[in-house]
Amino acid sequence: MTFDHDLKASVRTIPDYPKPGIMFRDITTLLADARAFRRAVDELVNPWAGNKIDKVAGMEARGFIIGGAVAHQLSAGFVPIRKKGKLPHTTVRIAYSLEYGIDEMEMHVDAIQPGERVILVDDLIATGGTAEGAVKLLRQIGANVVAACFIIDLPELGGAAKLRAMDVPVRTLMTFEGH
């Protein structure tokens, strides 16, 4: 489901950032607008209200902001998924593909127990490489990935379709054309 109209207007577009040809979708304006931020979180949470969700996993960095708010609304725990080397305790790690190479992400090995119901959250899905890696990481430790939620989808880049092909339901609030 997409909530495009007034919520979409709260996202700033910056052309040619971080490089020429890219239309950067800046959610800091949505986050700064209390009503828009509240509505976005409420719309991400609504499908799971009343369902048992054990944890919300957020991808670095804007996924921490949105995921923390979603976890609070669902009375669930929050689990940060970070770039390698950023967590102080024993971690589980996975390599994942980026547009121009490979990177690694990790989470604390004891953050999620096998069988726990988890929602993955981030601000935007583009090619889906990072989200795909996060789903694989969560499944590697036995999580039941119930869904992945994003404020913005760039459907031309195929990320949401990639997650659906992994049997992960995807919820987005708005779409933008292009990169």
From Swiss-Prot:
Keyword set includes Transferase: yes
SUPFAM superfamilies: PRTase-like
Compartment list: Cytoplasm
Reaction catalysed by this enzyme: AMP + diphosphate = 5-phospho-alpha-D-ribose 1-diphosphate + adenine
Main location: cytoplasm
Major enzyme class: transferase
Enzyme Commission number, as recorded: 2.4.2.7
Pathway this chain belongs to: Purine metabolism; AMP biosynthesis via salvage pathway; AMP from adenine: step 1/1
Keywords attached to this entry: Cytoplasm, Glycosyltransferase, Purine salvage, Transferase
Keyword Hydrolase tagged: no
CC terms in the record's Gene Ontology section: cytoplasm
Protein family (similarity comment): Belongs to the purine/pyrimidine phosphoribosyltransferase family.
UniProt subunit comment: Homodimer.
Name under which the protein is recorded: Adenine phosphoribosyltransferase
The species this protein was found in: Bradyrhizobium diazoefficiens (strain JCM 10833 / BCRC 13528 / IAM 13628 / NBRC 14792 / USDA 110)
The gene coding this protein: apt
